[in-house]
Amino acid sequence: MKALVAATALGPALLLLLPAASRADERKKGPKVTAKVFFDLRVGEEDAGRVVIGLFGKTVPKTVENFVALATGEKGFGFKGSKFHRVIKDFMIQGGDFTRGDGTGGKSIYGDRFPDENFKLKHYGPGWVSMANAGKDTNGSQFFITTVKTAWLDGKHVVFGKVLEGMDVVRKVENTKTDSRDKPLKDVTIADCGTIEVEKPFAIAKE
């Protein structure tokens, strides 16, 4: 009888713990990946490998639509053949300037620039993909991939994706030699790019 009472007493306690644990899991659970884009990178004349990026179309639909269209080239312009023009170790790698190639160009599918969609997501750690800009509401086509947590960029740059595969390729680019302006000495080129089907949206952790 005593054992039964003890088990009964434990029951409510366990039940009370479950909602709290669920809330903790919800907080840890990040945005849902609704689309994927791949970049096949080349450093100099050597193939460096493939980077697969998950995109959060429910959180930042307009930003994701722009990125996907630039990856497929469906509007007649986009990322294919463009370069990562700025690389800073222990910070990020930046690309997407397919008009000038030096960080001063690029354009969106909506026109030259488009507004910041929202800042719901943060730069939680390595591998998060965010829009480069020249200040408020100046998004075009340039983006960067973090190689460390960059909390100081939160609320200033729109995060819209995360590297799902090929972070080793990102690291390879991060460690390439650069000049005094952070430009790689060997061209880091997006040799090919496009989309990968996502059958069902899935959430990833904020890490």
Curated annotation (Swiss-Prot):
EC number per UniProt: 5.2.1.8
Chain ranges of the PPIase cyclophilin-type domain: 38-195
Similarity comment: family membership: Belongs to the cyclophilin-type PPIase family. PPIase B subfamily.
Protein's name in the database: Peptidyl-prolyl cis-trans isomerase B
Any GO MF annotation of the entry: cyclosporin A binding
Gene3D superfamilies (UniProt xref): Cyclophilin-like (2.40.100.10)
Entry superkingdom: Eukaryota
Record's signal peptide: 1-24
Coiled-coil regions, chain positions: none
Location relative to the cell: Endoplasmic reticulum lumen; Melanosome
SUPFAM superfamilies: Cyclophilin-like (SSF50891)
BP-aspect Gene Ontology terms: chaperone-mediated protein folding; negative regulation of collagen fibril organization; protein folding
Activity modulation comment: Inhibited by cyclosporin A (CsA).
Function: PPIase that catalyzes the cis-trans isomerization of proline imidic peptide bonds in oligopeptides and may therefore assist protein folding.
Catalysed reactions listed for this entry: [protein]-peptidylproline (omega=180) = [protein]-peptidylproline (omega=0)
Species this chain originates from: Gallus gallus
CDD domains, per database record: cyclophilin_ABH_like
Keywords for this protein: Endoplasmic reticulum, Isomerase, Rotamase, Signal
One GO CC annotation: melanosome
